[in-house]
């Protein structure tokens, strides 16, 4: 929810925030904002090369998407300021990755997912328990789910055709099959029923489908 995200940002922006010697406060401030504002998977974010980010036109080139799907991901200037600031303060001559490990090379997912779940979420007052008893509960991948739901809601609020919104969002997220987006968004609300029913047809008509 918006309230939970505000608490998460409050935690990572706090001067009292402390992580291990490999991961600075600025790293988490920038990474979590990137994931929340773009819907990137954690692995995609950590795979980003400095050269994959166009700081002038505010576009990210994702070359390591799931299923070898490449795509362009635009971002707002407000996020761009964080990315530029991080790059200026953290990048060193010879670095390849945008989030280069202090020891060189790509950072590992595990420590980051653990810190988010065991450190940041509890400090934000967010329960680690699953809401339905079946899923794994909130984790860093939940930021992608939150982005997707917010994006669809915003498109509908702006008066855009909801029948076309889902397939375009599917492409933005790097899905090759709209059913992945349907499951991912958990469209169980009554107002989205028609979107699911016509989603396959729209995906084939507008984007040509694929799996």
Range-by-range predicted roles:
Residues 1-211:
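Conserved catalytic core of the tyrosine transesterase superfamily
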């Amino acid at each position: 929810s918006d309230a939970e995200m505000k608490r998460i940002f409050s935690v990572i922006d706090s001067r009292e925030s402390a992580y291990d010697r490999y991961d600075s406060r600025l790293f988490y401030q920038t990474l979590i904002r990137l994931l929340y504002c773009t819907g990137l998977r954690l692995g995609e974010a950590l795979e980003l090369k400095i050269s994959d980010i166009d700081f002038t036109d505010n576009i990210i080139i994702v070359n390591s998407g799931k299923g070898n799907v490449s795509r362009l991901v635009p971002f707002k200037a407000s996020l761009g300021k964080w990315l530029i600031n991080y790059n200026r303060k953290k990048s060193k001559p010879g670095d390849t990755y945008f989030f280069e490990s202090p020891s060189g090379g790509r950072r590992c997912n595990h420590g980051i997912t653990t810190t988010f779940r065991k450190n940041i979420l509890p400090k934000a007052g967010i329960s680690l328990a699953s809401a339905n008893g079946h899923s794994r509960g909130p984790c860093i991948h939940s930021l992608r789910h939150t982005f997707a739901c917010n994006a669809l809601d915003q498109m509908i609020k702006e008066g855009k055709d909801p029948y076309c919104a889902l397939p375009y969002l599917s492409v933005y997220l790097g899905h090759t099959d709209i059913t992945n987006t349907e499951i991912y968004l958990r469209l169980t609300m009554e107002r989205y029923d028609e979107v699911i029913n016509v989603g396959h047809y729209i995906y084939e008509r507008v984007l040509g489908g694929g799996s």
